[in-house]
Amino acid sequence: MSGNADALKKAAAEAAMQYIEDGTVVGVGTGSTVNFFIDALAERKHDIEGAVSSSEASTERLKSHGIEVFELNSVVEVPIYVDGADEITEHGQMVKGGGGALTREKIIAAVARKFVCVADESKMVGRLGQFPVPVEVIPMARSYVAREIVKLGGDPVWRQGFTTDNGNWILDVHNFDIMEPMKLEAELNNIVGVVTNGLFAQRGADIALIAREDGVQTLKVSG
């Protein structure tokens, strides 16, 4: 089963290569599907200027392939950002951050002109919320943020033993009834001590490449 899942992830990741423009800096996300994208990108490393990366793990993989990794502050434009999702709807709204890289992912997504999500069909959902919503918090605010999240109807669980690349902690929030993703995303971000959360609703995917048994489906959300 895992071999088949990997084949679907690889198919979705390789389909994203059609959107890569020569001579540009490519935004690169984090996760198992993105790892396949990085491997495919290596075959065109001489065509691109380099990449900006959303995690130390992706940076390490990019560099191992000889792809130059730039600091985001030194880059003027990121034409495309390729990343996976833990859940995605037909509207391109997502839950992301199961791997803990949500803040840097959200920053690069905000900068990028186009967001291409690569995923297998198991990630497509009618409504977000089955997968816990990760919330990155400043460590000293963990208990306070957790209490505020309970008031919003969520059940926060501290991801003990995990520290983000930014030196912060993660609360995985279960049992959210997500009827209005953009509203909940804003409410979570308004809690003092929250860095950001894994709802990508205000800035979702422009294109979703969903790998199924019979091929890769292209879902154009906007643009």
From Swiss-Prot:
One of its GO terms (cellular component) is cytosol. InterPro entries: NagB/RpiA_transferase-like (IPR037171), Ribose5P_isomerase_typA_subgr (IPR020672), Ribose5P_isomerase_type_A (IPR004788). The active site is at residue 105. The keyword Isomerase applies. One of its GO terms (biological process) is pentose-phosphate shunt, non-oxidative branch. The keyword Transport does not apply. CDD domains: RPI_A (cd01398). Pathway: Carbohydrate degradation; pentose phosphate pathway; D-ribose 5-phosphate from D-ribulose 5-phosphate (non-oxidative stage): step 1/1. Substrate binds at residues 30-33, 83-86, 96-99, 123. It comes from the Bacteria. Keywords: Isomerase. It catalyses: aldehydo-D-ribose 5-phosphate = D-ribulose 5-phosphate. Homodimer. NCBIfam families: PRK00702.1, rpiA. Catalyzes the reversible conversion of ribose-5-phosphate to ribulose 5-phosphate. Belongs to the ribose 5-phosphate isomerase family. This is Ribose-5-phosphate isomerase A. It comes from Idiomarina loihiensis (strain ATCC BAA-735 / DSM 15497 / L2-TR). The gene is rpiA.
